[in-house]
């Protein structure tokens, strides 16, 4: 008998060690038309009033597969620092960054679904509303820009990798989750003011705080032309009223052949010479940008 009990206890302990924290699908109050799924990773040692980090996947991916990608180290960061990561999963193969639903505050698209996930995460995990952060690569980088434009009041800072300006993938026919060759190829160019107007039009009349933006791009990006880096910088410099030239630059930082350009406390660009699509996430540098 005793032997059997010991075996049972030992088995339970082993099972709980093996199970531990895991990416889990969570239902959330969602008033958007988009039925994007919400997945969450709560580390075993979550801190009180945890920061919430939204990690947005690329095309032909999902919350589950992105969270297993070795170049996307946010689960490990969560284990180490105790913040919670929210992993939205797109209803289409890419995020909808082309239709009016998604390109507008309250439009009902994927961006609104993700905003609902942020609200729910803050409520369910008693998250810190002053420490909500967004990151993503490629299509997730595009969505990061769109979220910053459509739901600025929910987000403190963004660190986005290899995306395009907010609104650059707009579909002339209003299509959902459409690819846009003009933008991806780097031919969608506009003045800083025109790009800034695109952001302002996504939430007309908004005059509150906006997230601090960190923009990464590789010079050898063959999927989303490097010109999209310059266009994104033009966009946010205009929104923040910064000059077009960086106020300070650091060569070979945070890595060799990367250059960091600071435009003001709300905008930093990091251009990776020789790096293709998509620039791997640098957990340390993104966490630093988030103040974690
Ligand atoms: C959707 O829900 C959010 C809160 O999660 C709320 O702020 C917003 O007003 C709602 N929108 C509509 C159209 O009901
Ligand atoms: C692609 O996006 C640009 C803006 O970046 C827009 O002017 C153009 O109409 C879009 N193309 C299509 C086919 O929707
Ligand atoms: C990431 O950035 C930090 C500085 O924030 C730097 O020290 C580190 O070398 C970078 N990581 C990699 C893998 O290059």
Where are these regions (language model features)?
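The conserved beta1-alpha1 loop
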Residues: 51-58, 162, 217, 273
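Short substrate-entry loop that stabilizes the transition state in hydrolases
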Residues: 46-95, 168, 225, 279
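Short beta-strand/loop motif that positions the catalytic acidic residue
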Residues: 215-217, 221
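A domain-start/cap signature at the N-terminus of enzymes
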Residues: 2-52, 83-84, 130, 135-139, ...
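Gly/Ser-rich "nucleophile elbow"/oxyanion-hole loop immediately N-terminal to the catalytic nucleophile
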Residues: 44-49, 97-139, 149-155
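Short beta-strand immediately N-terminal to the catalytic nucleophile in serine-hydrolase-like folds
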Residues: 134-136, 161, 216
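Active-site nucleophile loop of the alpha/beta-hydrolase fold
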Residues: 159-168
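Cap/lid segment of the alpha/beta-hydrolase catalytic domain
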Residues: 87-109, 171-172, 176-179
């Amino acid at each position: 008998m005793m032997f059997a009990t010991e075996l049972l206890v030992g088995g339970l302990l082993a099972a709980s060690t093996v199970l531990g924290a895991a990416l889990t699908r969570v239902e959330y109050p969602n008033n958007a038309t988009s039925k994007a799924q919400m997945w969450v990773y709560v580390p075993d040692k979550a801190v009180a009033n945890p920061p919430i980090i939204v990690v947005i996947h690329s095309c032909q991916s999902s919350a589950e597969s992105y969270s297993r990608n070795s170049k996307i180290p946010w689960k490990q960061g969560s284990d180490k620092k105790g913040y919670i990561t929210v992993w939205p999963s797109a209803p289409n193969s890419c995020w909808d960054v082309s239709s009016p639903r998604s390109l507008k505050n309250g439009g009902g698209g994927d961006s609104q679904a993700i905003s609902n996930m942020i609200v729910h995460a803050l409520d369910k995990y008693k998250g810190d509303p002053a420490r909500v952060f967004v990151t993503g690569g490629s299509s997730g980088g595009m969505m990061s820009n769109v979220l910053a434009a459509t739901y600025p009041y929910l987000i403190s800072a963004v660190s986005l990798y290899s995306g395009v300006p907010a609104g650059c993938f707009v579909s002339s026919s209003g299509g959902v989750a459409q690819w846009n060759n003009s933008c991806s190829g780097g031919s969608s160019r506009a003045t800083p003011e025109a790009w800034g107007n695109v952001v302002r039009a996504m939430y007309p009349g908004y005059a509150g705080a906006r997230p601090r933006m960190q923009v990464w791009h590789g010079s050898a990006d063959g999927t989303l032309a490097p010109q999209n880096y310059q266009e994104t910088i033009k966009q946010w410099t205009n929104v923040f009223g910064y000059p077009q030239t960086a106020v300070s630059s650091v060569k070979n930082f945070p890595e060799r052949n990367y250059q960091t350009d600071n435009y003001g406390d709300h905008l930093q660009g990091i251009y990776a010479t020789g790096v293709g699509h998509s620039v791997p996430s640098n957990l340390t540098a993104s966490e630093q940008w988030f103040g974690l």
